A protein has these predicted regions:
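Active-site core segments that coordinate phosphate-bearing ligands/cofactors
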Residues: 2-169
């Protein structure tokens, strides 16, 4: 038995999957890792261009995955709100997001301007303005923008994994 090398690999190895059909995983923390298990790595140019990687997991299974900026954006915007005197729990933030219209604007969570701490509300607004989208004005709209942008990023990653593996999730 070969042990998994880090926490995400351990979580993937422990997934309750009955072996019927295809299964994908999403490990979402500061970073998000989304992918599937394979018996052999995929080493194609397309896979490389899609920024998909092969990691050896438990029992020599391949964790074929994409790294995505995850809840870092939520953690950072929460810190920015706190600095401005607005203290929100994560539940509060979810409720604020639920009050806003859906699909008003999207960001690329992996865009370089979001990698550094500080000024996240302004960075999101500037991104939306620069890309000709509705600019989020409220805390809830900013939060919803992040959550929906992550969801779209995950959807796109699953599509890339499907295109590279042929697996349907």
């Amino acid at each position: 038995v070969k042990a998994a090398g880090h926490d995400t690999q351990c979580a993937v190895a422990a997934m309750p999957w009955d072996g019927i059909g295809e299964a994908a995983f999403l490990s979402c923390g500061t970073w998000s890792l989304i992918g599937c298990e394979l018996e052999k790595p995929i080493l194609t140019r397309r896979s490389m261009e899609d920024e998909l990687s092969n990691e050896i997991g438990a029992n020599n299974q391949i964790n074929y995955l994409k790294n995505i900026s995850g809840l870092w954006l939520i953690q950072e915007i929460r810190r920015n709100f706190r600095e401005e005197g607005r203290e929100y729990s994560y539940n509060d933030m979810e409720q604020l997001a639920r009050t806003e219209p859906s699909f008003a604007c999207f960001i690329d969570p992996d865009a370089s301007e979001f990698a550094q701490p500080g000024g996240m509300p302004e960075k999101i607004r500037a991104y939306c303005e620069r890309t000709g989208q509705e600019v989020p004005q409220t805390d809830g709209a900013l939060i919803r923008c992040i959550y929906e942008s992550l969801s779209m990023k995950y959807r796109n990653a699953i599509a890339q994994i499907h295109e590279n593996t042929g697996k349907k999730f």
